[in-house]
Amino acid sequence: MSVLDALWEDRDVRFDLSAQQMKTRPGEVLIDCLDSIEDTKGNNGDRGRLLVTNLRILWHSLALSRVNVSVGYNCILNITTRTANSKLRGQTEALYILTKCNSTRFEFIFTNLVPGSPRLFTSVMAVHRAYETSKMYRDFKLRSALIQNKQLRLLPQEHVYDKINGVWNLSSDQGNLGTFFITNVRIVWHANMNDSFNVSIPYLQIRSIKIRDSKFGLALVIESSQQSGGYVLGFKIDPVEKLQESVKEINSLHKVYSASPIFGVDYEMEEKPQPLEALTVEQIQDDVEIDSDGHTDAFVAYFADGNKQQDREPVFSEELGLAIEKLKDGFTLQGLWEVMS
């Protein structure tokens, strides 16, 4: 299993997380912590804390920590500022984040309750930009600008452990002769005749590393994650002793990486925040049993109904005694009142 198969923090939007899901995963680093932040869209009037990591934004209510949200950077479509109406601050400039997760759009509005502080905007925007510009650490890449003057263009925090000449890429019937690099974050191969014919495979995207028999003899076979396209790549390394040594080294580096991934999001605040565990309020177990089966209402307040072309037809509500717009499938009037309260 690749590290990516277990990674959800940067590629998901989740609500009402458990205490375990609020904790940082291996490789996740807390970059900034902002107190007195209101979730104006979903919990207007509720003072909370915003946590900025290298993978996501977390917000939780200070009054009730199980009221929370996690927004992965990979889901973000747009970040901007706009005027919002806060119950605690009135009309003020707020951070607006539009996201898309599993074909559903959510929008979030966060307001800093400390007047005159731009830190909410600068922190989130800068870290998201750092995430967007460091995708080479995390994404499977074909035909990228990897090589300069026959040398691998190293990423920050990247170190080359081995460079092997005369490695055949077995993607075609004849094979292509090239150079193979093993680093602490990825595997890179490029053709000697044309260095723009290349591939970069981060350990994050590697599902399996094996030695298999092929029509060219024994070969190194790397299978990438389903998210990257499920590629199966073969490389011929001679002699066999060097092949076995390389596979052993790659497996060892992959194991080290899996224990402590390098995601490449490099951004530091002048003041270091406390660890996330120290900042998250412990969740208190209530005597009330909460039935979460089939509950679709927790995040209804965050829906960005961007696909709605016109108002839905009005229907008479016996509960309210007046005509209302027909609700979307799966939602009830009672559920909407629960979100409001």
Swiss-Prot record:
Record's function text: The BBSome complex is thought to function as a coat complex required for sorting of specific membrane proteins to the primary cilia. The BBSome complex is required for ciliogenesis but is dispensable for centriolar satellite function. This ciliogenic function is mediated in part by the Rab8 GDP/GTP exchange factor, which localizes to the basal body and contacts the BBSome. Rab8(GTP) enters the primary cilium and promotes extension of the ciliary membrane.
Record flagged with keyword Zinc: no
PANTHER family: BARDET-BIEDL SYNDROME 5 PROTEIN (PTHR21351:SF0), BARDET-BIEDL SYNDROME PROTEIN 5 (PTHR21351)
Alphabetized SMART domains for the sequence: DM16
Disease: Bardet-Biedl syndrome 5: A syndrome characterized by usually severe pigmentary retinopathy, early-onset obesity, polydactyly, hypogenitalism, renal malformation and intellectual disability. Secondary features include diabetes mellitus, hypertension and congenital heart disease. Bardet-Biedl syndrome inheritance is autosomal recessive, but three mutated alleles (two at one locus, and a third at a second locus) may be required for clinical manifestation of some forms of the disease.
Residue runs in coiled coils: none
Record key words, sorted: Bardet-Biedl syndrome, Cell membrane, Cell projection, Ciliopathy, Cilium, Cilium biogenesis/degradation, Cytoplasm, Cytoskeleton, Disease variant, Intellectual disability, Membrane, Obesity, Protein transport, Sensory transduction, Transport, Vision
Family under the similarity heading: Belongs to the BBS5 family.
Protein name as catalogued: BBSome complex member BBS5
Further remark: BBS5 may interact genetically with BBS1.
Gene Ontology terms for molecular function: phosphatidylinositol-3-phosphate binding; RNA polymerase II-specific DNA-binding transcription factor binding
Subcellular location, principal: membrane
Cited InterPro entries: BBL5, BBS5/fem-3, BBS5_PH, PH-like_dom_sf
Subunit structure: Part of BBSome complex, that contains BBS1, BBS2, BBS4, BBS5, BBS7, BBS8/TTC8, BBS9 and BBIP10. Binds to phosphoinositides. Interacts with CCDC28B. Interacts with SMO; the interaction is indicative for the association of SMO with the BBsome complex to facilitate ciliary localization of SMO. Interacts with PKD1. Interacts with DLEC1.
Outcome when changing R207H: Found as heterozygous variant in patients with Bardet-Biedl syndrome; might have a modifying effect on disease phenotype
Biological process according to GO: cilium assembly; heart looping; intracellular transport; melanosome transport; motile cilium assembly; protein transport; visual perception
Compartments, record wording: Cell projection, Cilium membrane; Cytoplasm; Cytoplasm, Cytoskeleton, Cilium basal body; Cytoplasm, Cytoskeleton, Microtubule organizing center, Centrosome, Centriolar satellite
Gene3D superfamilies per record: Pleckstrin-homology domain (PH domain)/Phosphotyrosine-binding domain (PTB)
Recorded GO CC terms: axoneme; BBSome; centriolar satellite; ciliary basal body; ciliary membrane; cytosol
